[in-house]
Amino acid sequence: SPVCTPSGQPCQPNTQPCCNNAEEEQTINCNGNTVYRCA
């Protein structure tokens, strides 16, 4: 299953969205990689 970067944790490259509610997903850029963090 996909693993997201939990809120408040450092960026992790190449993670996938995993929040149940898309509105809780925040797309951020970390060193040129698109990563996902749960709001």
From Swiss-Prot:
Coiled coil: none
A cellular component term, taken from the record's GO annotations: extracellular region
Post-translational modifications: Contains 3 disulfide bonds.
Tissue specificity remark: Expressed by the venom gland.
Keyword vocabulary terms for this entry: Calcium channel impairing toxin, Disulfide bond, Ion channel impairing toxin, Knottin, Neurotoxin, Secreted, Toxin, Voltage-gated calcium channel impairing toxin
GO biological process: defense response
TM helices/strands, residue ranges: none
Pfam families registered for this protein in UniProt: Omega-toxin
S-S bonds: 4-19, 11-30, 18-38
InterPro entries in UniProt: Omega-atracotox, Omega-atracotox_CS
Site residues, Critical for insecticidal activity: 10, 29, 37
Keyword Ion transport on entry: no
Molecular function GO labels: calcium channel inhibitor activity; toxin activity
UniProt-annotated location(s): Secreted
Chief location: secreted
Function comment: Potent inhibitor of insect, but not mammalian, voltage-gated calcium channels (Cav).
UniProt free text on domains: The presence of a 'disulfide through disulfide knot' structurally defines this protein as a knottin.
Record family assignment: Belongs to the neurotoxin 08 (Shiva) family. 02 (omega/kappa toxin) subfamily.
Protein name per its UniProtKB record: Omega-actinopoditoxin-Mb1a
Originating organism: Missulena bradleyi
